[in-house]
Amino acid sequence: KAVESLGCVSVICSDKTGTLTQNKMHVEEVYLNGMTCKPDEMTLESSLQRFFLYNAILNNDASITDGKVLGDPTESALLEMFHEVRLNQDRTENVGQLTIQEETIRNMIPRLEEIPFDSERKCMSSKYRLHGEEEIIFTKGAVDVLLNRCINVAYEEEIRPMDNVEIAKIQKQNQHFSENGLRVLAFACKKSGGELTVEKENGLT
């Protein structure tokens, strides 16, 4: 009977990644410095792009074991994006020490604390030690959530206030990505010492 009923179905709706697909995701586009780019167009020589990539692989629980990426599909896609950038740069620019493995970066910049993602906050944050005693919080999550938590936006040459003009540009790009069937994540950070708390997921850039 169930099979007969299924034969009459013309549309199946599902909100679970992997139900009807391969449970695999890939980073298609990145919006940085007021413009979009593909992962293979990014470079570790750009300080803004490099900082974004560090955010993507550090505030991330996916890992590589025996050449396979293991973990949440979204976080796995971010890890694969970093390798795509790194391998492409190896082929085209041969910049040596900049093209280091994500494992090396994770060892150089250790995770001190984390607040895992949950459906209420719609974001995930981790704290790291960069240079000496300097500590930084990396956050990723839903665009609308992080927009409300950010006070600045980073460009290659400057940090600008998150005013109505910047908010409108980001919202427009978010809508464009969504209309093209892409899942959209926002990334932010801030320097902060002391214990990592939910309250510190504010005042971000």
Question: Across the structure, where does each feature detected by a protein language model lie?
Answer:
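Conserved cytosolic headpiece of P-type ATPases
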Residues: 1-205
